[in-house]
């Protein structure tokens, strides 16, 4: 689409030169102070004025308050009126109601607005629809909005000299200020009301040392929370704090920032950014405050998952090539596990896999059956310890033997077992033993519950211990999933112990995902779930198990895994500083000591970072309308064609090479389509363009196209011309299509071609292997030649397909066309899993499949006749 090309060009110029692009927006700001450059999603550039955070804006007496800010302050202080009510329990109920209202307004109100702003630019569209920033609009709402902006920015601020997107963001900020400040204020009111309840219960009914410990511990959490917020704001500024990237982009801010607190924790504003809430709960000694904090934090994580993360992926996500590489690596990862996701715990369970069923039976036996029939808790404890010791010794010894002597690999090769199979066998053994240990631990605690035996160490604060224990268990589960997501199943099952580095797709240790923050996340969080079990049920037996788990985890990581990693990847690669270490050094350790302690190699700092450009990111904002499920009749499609509306037009489009049929003219999938155009020479623009579209997606309008052409277009530089649409400029699916002639780089339609159909070619699979040669040539001509340039039916497909930007999509296209053309389903993984596969091999596979299907059909019908 031409407009996207222009936007990319503008962004490229702004990113690669210090000279400002001479756009209309910039020319209006030449005399203004320089600041960060912004660009709207329509391509308009401007200088982003300085703004202040909500606390400074609302509470700094030196800053003039806007109209909305005065209203916000009034609403905040109005909460104090509730304290005039003498009944404190009623106050608590009222404040909780207020908090729920503001929290829902935050996560679902702001969330809804941001989601639609991200997908549809809703807020900006409202501003345009109601002309909120038009000086000539005398509507009350427009005057109110313009008055608010003037009161924010001053009378010298020229509203029309800034994009609508920026002005809309300024108004949206006040809406955010109201909700966020009200949310926090009502929560503090809940904390205070609960603390003073029952004659200041938060400092009574406890030993003084415990009370002081609560207050100090809670205060530390609150101060840490404050530092997180301040550091985060100093890092990302107002632009990201107020979700500015939902409205416009800042030049040279095309990548996510990993600095300060963002280098220590994933999504710190949503994760550790709420620990202060739990600090308030600790100080107030109130389960009501704790539940309120959990409620607010839970809703915030929902907001992160459904609103923030999708937008982050859309704007800052990896490029198409990086996504493609990740997909390939994950699929290649499964080659070591029979192309199926291996069992981790009981995750990825498959009833058709015998090892999975055996794992389930053993887990149920150790976790349920044995505890139910056990005569004493001592026997359960001995079983748990024995199982853990057996797992620890056997796994550790095997890893040492494999690392030092390649014991497992030599045994596999001597028995003619491929090394990939040896890793799969190891994975089954490793996971089975891990499952036994955790099942035994679960069975031990189930035995306590069934026999009604209480804790022998601590009996108080059960609900608090339950909450903290469940949090630790969840943390271990989440960390494990994050580790798998970062290093794959290959890394989870110690794949680099079994597969040579030259044959592995992993050449370096990852610094992505959870490993961005910690070098060894499993060392800290790998057994925190067992600590959680002890916290919930603090017995001597559980304490012993907890220590046993921790010691084994420490030994395995530091004396087995780390030594092997250093041998393979090098000491500098293994010992380089994690995000947490870097931040602690930066803020707490003097520079002189830092330089002596640093593990970073200076040569590393010259490396090129893998990132996405703003131009690539903007691709995600050219919205595609979804394919309609409405089925249109052929006659209806003809009625929708341009020929009935522009019969006397001076513009013409004609399509060459279409085949005749009883209904619409047609061509086959992948066949190049040549289109000719004709336009009046006196009005022709070199920016006129022709695009290819599916009719069911453009039937809403014959005069304007609002759907992205997704690259299927070409400029009409001359008033008459011919262009052949082929390969990436074609649709590779069946349907009814049309060409549209657009004027002057815009989306106004001057002419629409006759509708035509794209069909799958029909290829008959022979039943005799002797015909494989001719069949291979037919596959090459009708399918493969349309997608890749392959010379021979015996040439490997992979090296040529890998030259494409997205090899996964190429393989999927192969399988789709073959399946539709031959009526035999073929999975794209046959191309991915065999680098030497040729067209001839594909032909033989199809013939073999047909022969098997014919035999099965024959036997089936034969049985019916008996």
Curated annotation (Swiss-Prot):
Keywords: Endoplasmic reticulum, Lipid biosynthesis, Lipid metabolism, Membrane, Methyltransferase, Phospholipid biosynthesis, Phospholipid metabolism, S-adenosyl-L-methionine, Transferase, Transmembrane, Transmembrane helix
Entry coiled-coil feature ranges: none
Gene Ontology cellular-component terms listed: endoplasmic reticulum membrane
Annotated catalysed reactions: a 1,2-diacyl-sn-glycero-3-phosphoethanolamine + S-adenosyl-L-methionine = a 1,2-diacyl-sn-glycero-3-phospho-N-methylethanolamine + S-adenosyl-L-homocysteine + H(+)
UniProt keyword Secreted, yes or no: no
Pfam families xrefs: PEMT
Lumenal topological segments: 1-65, 115-175, 229-263, 308-353, 401-425, 475-523
Entry's localization field: Endoplasmic reticulum membrane
Cytoplasmic side: 87-93, 197-207, 285-286, 375-379, 447-453, 545-866
Listed EC numbers: 2.1.1.17
InterPro entries per the UniProt record, alphabetical: Phopholipid_MeTrfase, Phosphatid-EA_MeTrfase_fun
Topology of the protein relative to the lipid bilayer: Multi-pass membrane protein
Gene Ontology MF terms: phosphatidylethanolamine N-methyltransferase activity
GO biological process: methylation; phosphatidylcholine biosynthetic process
Transmembrane segment boundaries: 66-86, 94-114, 176-196, 208-228, 264-284, 287-307, 354-374, 380-400, 426-446, 454-474, 524-544
Pathway, per record: Phospholipid metabolism; phosphatidylcholine biosynthesis
Function: Catalyzes the first step of the methylation pathway of phosphatidylcholine biosynthesis, the SAM-dependent methylation of phosphatidylethanolamine (PE) to phosphatidylmonomethylethanolamine (PMME).
Family: Belongs to the class VI-like SAM-binding methyltransferase superfamily. CHO2 family.
Protein name, entry field: Phosphatidylethanolamine N-methyltransferase
